[in-house]
Amino acid sequence: MPLPVALQTRLAKRGILKHLEPEPEEEIIAEDYDDDPVDYEATRIEGLPPSWYKVFDPSCGLPYYWNVETDLVSWLSPHDPNFVVTKSAKKVRNNNADAEDKSDRNLEKVDRNHEKSDRSHEKPDRSHEKADRNHEKNDRERERNYDKVDRERDRDRERERAFDKADREEGKDRRHHRREELAPYPKNKKATSRKDEELDPMDPSSYSDAPRGTWSTGLPKRNEAKTGADTTAAGPLFQQRPYPSPGAVLRANAEASRTKQQD
């Protein structure tokens, strides 16, 4: 790989490098940076009419003639008898593209109009649906009102029946109370409840959970074996002692069997 020229010169000055390579010659290429394709020299030489110019077409490499005022072109010179003026291909393409865009826009506009008309047709349908929903809502509200009225009527009937029952009970109590006030004395002494009688303070039922006894409670029973034990005591902690004698038990059993046979 060759050394750069500046480095070779520096090394040659120091005496390190004695042979200098010749500097390569740079190739110079002339280019035309003018984008104007109009050939003014050919236009002047051919003596073209005013506003006509000879132009070079870079796409095909052929010249054509261009009128700058009308923006029309021709492949032949205006002095040629077969001279025909037309629009440029680029302009024709642009016009066609514009026409296509315009037609597309028109089609889109037509489609939008159709969609708008469809929506306008759908709008009455929605209005009908809304009216149907309103009718259904009114029907439901009417049914709820009817149900509410029926419930109120049922409550009124129940209230009236309760009032009638209370009035009947009150009248019945009033008649019973009046009958008791009019009676000079109770009809039957047995009708008086035993609960109305005063309890004997010595009765176990007055100070304990023992049941209230009768006039025969605690008296010796017939054909009962005399054990000498307290028969009123009950519960798991009480045991009847002393035990009766075997003879007393046999006599009691015999007496009970005779009584059963007589019955």
From Swiss-Prot:
Keyword tags: Immunity, Innate immunity, mRNA processing, mRNA splicing, Nucleus, Phosphoprotein, Repeat, Transcription, Transcription regulation
Keyword Transcription regulation: yes
Annotated stretches, region: 6 X 2 AA tandem repeats of [DE]-R: 150-161
Residues annotated with Phosphoserine modification: 245
UniProt feature, compositional bias: Basic and acidic residues: 99-173
Superkingdom of the organism of origin: Eukaryota
Region (5 X 7 AA approximate tandem repeats of D-R-[NS]-H-E-K-S): 104-138
UniProt xrefs under Gene3D superfamilies: 2.20.70.10, Glutaredoxin
One cellular-component annotation, GO: ciliary basal body
Stretches the record annotates as Disordered: 94-263
Region entry 3 X 2 AA tandem repeats of [DE]-R, spans: 139-144
Positions of transmembrane segments: none
Cellular compartment(s): Nucleus; Nucleus speckle; Cytoplasmic granule
Domain WW, residue spans: 46-80
One MF term in the entry's GO annotations: double-stranded DNA binding
Main location: nucleus
Any single GO BP term: positive regulation of defense response to virus by host
Region (Important for interaction with TXNL4A): 243-253
Renumbered ranges of Sequence repeats: 104-110, 111-117, 118-124, 125-131, 132-138, 139-140, 141-142, 143-144, 150-151, 152-153, 154-155, 156-157, 158-159, 160-161
Tissue and organ distribution: Detected in brain cortex and hippocampus neurons (at protein level). Expressed in brain with high level in cerebellar cortex, hippocampus and olfactory bulb.
Nucleus keyword on record: yes
Domain topic, free-text comment: The WW domain may play a role as a transcriptional activator directly or via association with the transcription machinery. The WW domain mediates interaction with WBP11, ATN1, SF3B1 and the C-terminal domain of the RNA polymerase II large subunit. Except for the WW domain, the protein is intrinsically disordered.
Function: Intrinsically disordered protein that acts as a scaffold, and which is involved in different processes, such as pre-mRNA splicing, transcription regulation, innate immunity and neuron development. Interacts with splicing-related factors via the intrinsically disordered region and regulates alternative splicing of target pre-mRNA species. May suppress the ability of POU3F2 to transactivate the DRD1 gene in a POU3F2 dependent manner. Can activate transcription directly or via association with the transcription machinery. May be involved in ATXN1 mutant-induced cell death.
Subunit structure and binding partners: Interacts with POU3F2/Brn-2, ATXN1, TXNL4A, HTT and AR. Interaction with ATXN1 correlates positively with the length of the polyglutamine tract. Interacts with RNA polymerase II large subunit in a phosphorylation-dependent manner. Forms a ternary complex with ATXN1 mutant and phosphorylated RNA polymerase II. Interacts (via C-terminus) with TXNL4A and CD2BP2. Interacts (via WW domain) with ATN1 and SF3B1, and may interact with additional splice factors. Interacts (via WW domain) with WBP11; Leading to reduce interaction between PQBP1 and TXNL4A. Interacts with CAPRIN1. Interacts with DDX1.
Protein's name according to its UniProt entry: Polyglutamine-binding protein 1
Organism: Mus musculus
Organism classification: Eukaryota, Metazoa, Chordata, Craniata, Vertebrata
